[in-house]
Amino acid sequence: TFNNTKIFKGTYGIIPEGPFVPLPEEIIDLEGVVKKNYFVEPLLRVQWVGEPVLKDDGTFEVQVKITRGTDNPDYQQPLEEAWLFVSQIDYVSNAPGAYSTKLSTNLTQADLRNYTLGDILTIRTGYPNGWNGGTGDPQKIDGSYKRPYFLRFGARTSKSFSSIKRYNFTDV
């Protein structure tokens, strides 16, 4: 959703950008309120399988499934990277400050080389036994620590748009 209340009356070229098959530019005459809906083909579809499980060592284990979102072969590059993002705020993404670098888990292309699209992938959050290896750090994720944590999984291919490789995400 995009809402900009500071655009002046005039003719504008609109190009939606994201981790999806690109759409052509649309020329729009803006005068007053304009509502536009765009339907896109994501590069990947990423979905949770079941619920996160809190393990005895204080980590969370999750399962996800990644599938292609488009049949267009020009946008079916191999998986390049995936993350299980963990955050203490409900807006979880790959943006700076929107995830914990200590608790999130990164899967590189090498980690994903044996993964087949459509299969279930099991991932754990980082730092078993809490930060510092379970030395009593109060940031440990366990049932006695009441601060909420939010999880989100994102995966991306090697395809870049405007020099940016973009993630497709699960919900939070």
Where are these regions (language model features)?
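Beta-sandwich strand segments
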Residues: 20-27, 74-76, 160-169
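Beta-strand-rich modules
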Residues: 7, 13, 119, 123-163, ...
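Solvent-exposed serine/threonine-rich low-complexity stretches and specific carbohydrate-binding patches
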Residues: 1, 95-126, 170
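Solvent-exposed, conformationally flexible loop/turn segments
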Residues: 30-35, 41-43, 57, 110-118, ...
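Proline-enriched interdomain boundary motifs that mark the N-terminal boundary
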Residues: 44-51
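Structured interaction patches on ligand/partner-binding surfaces of diverse proteins
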Residues: 5, 13-43
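Solvent-exposed loop/turn segments flanking beta-strands in beta-repeat/beta-sandwich domains
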Residues: 69-104
